[in-house]
Amino acid sequence: MAAMNTADIGFEKEIWKAADKMRGNIDASEYKSVVLGLIFLKYISDKFEAKYQQLVAEGEGFEEDKDEYLSNKNEKGSYDPVFYVPAEARWEAIAIHAHSPEIGTIIDNAMRAIEKENKRLKDILPKNFARPELDKRRLGEVVDLFTNIRMHEHGDSKDILGRAYEYCLSKFAEAEGKLAGEFYTPACIVKTLVNVLQPYKGRVYDPCCGSGGMFVQSAQFIENHSGNINNISVYGQD
């Protein structure tokens, strides 16, 4: 099993190094969806688990009520909906099968279960983890690595996994050269654009949104300036 990780500086490189071992003969575009899909799965599972434990602690029996997750509010009182993750798709259910030859199929089924419970995600999540070309032993090692992140000691899992997601995107961009412009604009450029726009309120529209970096940076801008995220609407196409 992978060693415990502190998620300090260099954590993103460790994620990339471990994930890159899975590549084998998989096409670059499909490999990208595997790596980023796994990060997304861990993120929504962690966020669901935090809300789940909060509801359990309240002791009113609403921890399996989907509406409680859709109506979730953050500590600032703003709506912060949480995707409902069914039991078979929660990270703990996946982690116990990390060293099983069926780990790819288990992850694919988890993605399907999440799509079924969250119509907004229908036909969006990657479901190619069971393909023969993907090294299941390496996949299990990456699952272990994610499992062993001590989130409670190193801040919000959203920040940690967000860093990993952005770092992996940049590495894919490096590997794909000029073609990467189809899905990725360097974060420093997007951040500069957002600082010029100062999106405190109104609409943020990106006609070539790719991986959604403009929207992420806009949300971070509002948070950094103590604004209200509910004062903006984001629109994008690609």
Regions found by a protein language model. Name each.
Residues L179-D238:
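Conserved S-adenosyl-L-methionine
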